Regions:
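N-terminal signal-anchor module of multipass membrane proteins
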Residues: 1-58, 170-177, 183-193, 212, ...
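Generic transmembrane alpha-helix signature in multi-pass membrane proteins
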Residues: 26-32, 64, 74-82, 185-189, ...
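Alpha-helical transmembrane segments in multi-pass membrane proteins
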Residues: 30, 41-49, 53, 57, ...
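Structural signature of hydrophobic alpha-helical transmembrane segments
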Residues: 31-44, 83-96, 167-179, 219-230
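Membrane-helix interface "capping/anchor" motifs
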Residues: 34-39, 55-67, 85-90, 106-117, ...
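Short, non-helical or kinked segments that cap or interrupt transmembrane helices
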Residues: 59-74, 115-117, 198-199, 203, ...
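Long hydrophobic alpha-helical segments that form multi-pass transmembrane helix bundles
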Residues: 118-179
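Hydrophobic alpha-helical bundle architecture
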Residues: 217-226, 234-249
Length: 305
């Protein structure tokens, strides 16, 4: 594969914080299996970032490692799902994909003194902005119930729990898909890039589901994978991608990640319920930043990515 084809797929693999073209290819196949619209959106987001990243102060190394493209890929996916079809919505999606890159650069520079990576912060910010601004524009509509008249958090423990589906949906929901086969393929894709990432993913997912079930999480939410996908990202970030920059003991960092991420998701979901916007990957961001700050040495290595 040429360098640009490698980059195209790395833009997708970097969503799970792994730099591997074959991982990106297998993930893309998983997306098409789960929902063709998501597969197509991921491709469009990756292509647009390929064509425009050089205009937003990215180095060739950053572009070809996929660091410029993973937020555009995520934004293309979620806005394709959240916005109702119209030419105005298409324009908003395209603008948002491009905006992800300068916003990512701004956040990266803002975080440099703290030696923290921007992660998926641009994705979260832009999605929230678009969902909230849709209330002020007649021709930009969303299927998300923004600013509901009432906010009610209902926990149902009587629904049948489907552990296998929930387990792999925890993984597939990274890309906003609830699909067992897609989740299996994404796990395999992670193993291709890093055996450690694959093993950590499986163990953390199992422990996370046990913890969430023990605490009495809503069974429907567990089945859909909404409680677990942030943990999948956090465990790869802390246990693999930024492992060398974190001076916490590996076992302690692992346990803290497994415990903190579901707690952060539950708190964030409740906090945002009255506003009506999804928590997205915000729990992953908060957990990862917290543990990276907790594990920083005094040598000031630059881990910003």
């Amino acid at each position: 594969m040429s360098k640009w084809i490698h980059t195209f797929f790395k833009n997708i693999s970097q969503v799970v914080l792994l730099e591997n073209a074959w991982t990106g290819l297998l993930i893309l196949i998983a997306l098409w299996i789960g929902n063709w619209k998501i597969g197509l959106a991921a491709m469009i987001g990756s292509v647009i970032s390929l064509l425009t990243a050089r205009f937003f102060n990215y180095t060739d190394e950053e572009i070809h490692s996929g660091l410029a493209g993973f937020n555009p890929v995520l934004i293309a996916i979620d806005l394709t799902l959240f916005l109702l079809w119209s030419w105005q919505s298409i324009l908003v999606i395209l603008i948002s994909i491009v905006l992800a890159m300068p916003i990512a650069q701004a956040i990266k520079n803002l975080l440099k003194p703290f030696r923290l990576p921007e992660l998926t912060t641009p994705f979260v910010i832009i999605t929230w902005v678009v969902l909230l601004m849709s209330q002020q524009f007649k021709f930009v509509k969303t299927n998300v119930d923004v600013l509901p008249l009432t906010a009610d958090v209902h926990v149902n423990l009587n629904t049948t729990f489907h552990p296998i589906h929930a387990f792999f949906s925890d993984v597939s929901q990274i890309f906003l898909i609830e699909h067992t086969i897609s989740g299996i393929l994404i796990v395999i894709a992670c193993f291709i890039a890093s055996r450690r990432a694959g093993i950590y993913l499986l163990i953390a997912n199992f422990l996370g589901l046990l913890l969430e079930f023990f605490f009495g999480a809503d069974i429907g939410t567990l089945n859909e994978g909404l409680f677990g996908f942030n943990l999948m990202l956090s465990i790869i970030a802390i246990g693999v991608t930024f492992r060398s920059a974190n001076h916490l003991k590996a076992a302690i960092a692992f346990i803290l990640t497994v415990v903190m991420t579901p707690m952060m998701y539950a708190a964030t979901a409740t906090f945002l319920e009255p506003i009506g916007i999804p928590s997205l990957t915000f729990p992953f961001i908060i957990t990862t930043w917290t543990l990276l700050l907790a594990g920083q040495s005094t040598a000031h290595p630059d881990i910003a990515k």
